[in-house]
Amino acid sequence: MKNVLSIQSHVVFGYAGNKSATFPMQLMGVDVWALNTVQFSNHTQYGKWTGMVIPKEQIGEIIRGIDEIGELKNCNAVVSGYLGSAEQVDEIIKAVEKVKSLNPQALYLCDPVMGHPDKGCIVADGVKEGLINLAVSHADILTPNLVELREISGLPVENFEQAIEAVKVIRAKGPKTVLIKHLSKVGKYADKFEMLLANDEGIWHLTRPLYTFAKEPVGVGDLTAGLFLANKVNGKSDLEAFEHMANAVNEVMKTTFELNSYELQLIAARKLIVNPVSSVKAVKIA
């Protein structure tokens, strides 16, 4: 069994961060070591929440504790997502470096959550800069959305062609694999959900159904990153991981839409996450 250290947010009610990523990865046969960066009552897009940011020192202490019992060497990958403070970036990179020193084959997937004020997603001051200046260069896999693609590349991304160029710029910064979670308004089709995957072998474009929610569910990016990484540690190629993830996420979104829910319906879709009925394929474009 493969082991993934998942350093993300935690919500008591609903699904975001580790609550979105852990169960689906476990369904894929991966043992998840969930380390929370915040503990909130609910995700921030409700507009109000209670809870706390986990002190940065606790991240290092917990990693050290796992190492002291001799288990850190068995970590196959690290994923980081929503961070509660800029200082946590440093602690996460220290954790990544420690894991890789013990297991040089371990992967680091950075989901560079930088906030989306228009959607009510708020991150602390300095997190964006820490991700850009430190985390990106350490990542083997980077999974930005459109906003993060612009911020990390430093380029305007107003159309599909510019998105491709921005991906190339980001790959030159260190990540071998870049997965754009949602092309949004720069995609080719207004009525589809579109994603990109880029690595040394080329660039792939994938479309899946787009569901129109009254309120967009949160945690889809966390689910996306988690499922992609679970497939990778299980030995799948980037393309295989990309296609399975896209189909599994589509099943979750379809189920959530049919149940008219604001929160992702992971439990209702649990069998479809492992064995999706959906069968969309990626198309190589470069």
From Swiss-Prot:
Biological source species: Mannheimia succiniciproducens (strain KCTC 0769BP / MBEL55E)
Keyword rRNA-binding listed: no
Cross-referenced SUPFAM superfamilies: Ribokinase-like
Presence of the UniProt keyword Magnesium in the record: yes
Protein's UniProt name: Pyridoxal kinase PdxY
Purpose of the protein: Pyridoxal kinase involved in the salvage pathway of pyridoxal 5'-phosphate (PLP). Catalyzes the phosphorylation of pyridoxal to PLP.
Catalytic activity from the UniProt record: pyridoxal + ATP = pyridoxal 5'-phosphate + ADP + H(+)
Binding site for substrate: S9, T44, Q45, D222
Quaternary organization: Homodimer.
